[in-house]
Swiss-Prot record:
Family per similarity comment: Belongs to the TACO1 family. YeeN subfamily.
InterPro entries attached to this UniProt entry: Integrase-like_N, TACO1_YebC-like_2nd/3rd_dom, TACO1_YebC_N, Transcrip_reg_TACO1-like, Transcrip_reg_TACO1-like_dom3, Transcrip_reg_TACO1_YeeN, YebC-like
Entry's Gene Ontology molecular function annotations: DNA binding
Lineage, top ranks: Bacteria, Bacillati, Bacillota, Bacilli, Lactobacillales
GO cellular component, one term: cytosol
This protein's name: Probable transcriptional regulatory protein STER_0242
Keywords assigned by UniProt, alphabetized: Cytoplasm, DNA-binding, Transcription, Transcription regulation
Length: 238
């Protein structure tokens, strides 16, 4: 698969301390999805999608159960989605999606991460117009044409299907991601490495040397924040 999706898979199978952060972030996401709808994935498509991704990230059952049980309770804890945009070195662009119970804290933390790691916060919309929201599905396979035909027959709005190194990558309109998954399952595909809604950069930049190291430090600082759910960028091979 492409380097970008290989990196996503690597993060999902990270070890030691990184796992606890990933599990905690999924716990919040599962809680919010269950709280906003029914705590049953069969009647709550948003929860079903989060649980699918949690499975890929090998989130333990007890973490999932705890989040769903919390949503069933009488807790009044409220989480708010947020998006921040900014710039790194040499034309690099970053989108940060958050889920937080304290917007002021999160905004300050994201701004600090940018400021202390060679980046600059931008205004809303200053970066996102250079990205396109897409559904992305990655799984083992080789015949891109056959997968494309399966999805077309299921009336899925599929944009592209790529095959590389024994891996299929499907790009769909974001509203058709669930439909594409169901179509693939109906055709016998059960295991998926990536099922995500992604912000895909329209163009990428290549960083080297100090610029690349600075950028990696900035991304690490952003992803280390407990309130940050996803970080998107336009740097190639990262």
């Amino acid at each position: 698969m492409g380097r970008k999706w290989a990196n996503i898979v690597a993060k999902k199978t990270a070890k030691d301390g990184a796992n606890s952060k990933i599990y905690a972030k999924f716990g919040v996401e599962i809680y919010v999805a269950a709280k906003q709808g029914e705590p049953d994935p069969e009647s709550n498509s948003a929860l079903k999608f989060v649980l699918e991704r949690a499975k890929q990230a090998q989130v333990p059952k007890h973490v999932i159960d705890k989040a769903i049980d919390k949503a069933k309770g009488n807790t009044d804890e409220t989480f708010v989605e947020g998006r921040y945009e900014g710039f790194g070195p040499n034309g690099s662009m970053i989108i940060v999606d958050t889920l937080t119970s304290n917007v002021n804290r999160t905004a300050a933390n994201v701004r600090t991460a940018f400021g202390k790691n060679g980046g600059n916060m931008g205004a809303s919309g200053s970066v996102s117009y250079m990205f396109d929201k897409k559904g992305v599905i990655v799984f083992a396979g080789e015949d891109a044409d056959a997968i494309f035909e399966q999805l077309l027959e299921a009336d899925v709005d599929v944009e592209d299907v790529e095959a590389e190194d024994g891996t299929i990558t499907v790009y769909t309109e974001p509203t058709d991601l669930h439909k594409a998954l169901e179509a693939l399952r109906a055709n016998g595909q059960e295991e998926f490495q990536v099922t995500e809604l992604e912000m895909i950069p329209q163009t990428e930049v290549t960083l080297e040397g100090e610029d690349l190291e600075t950028f990696k430090g900035l991304i690490d600082a952003l992803e280390a924040d407990d309130d940050v759910q996803k970080v998107y960028h336009n740097v190639a091979d990262m």
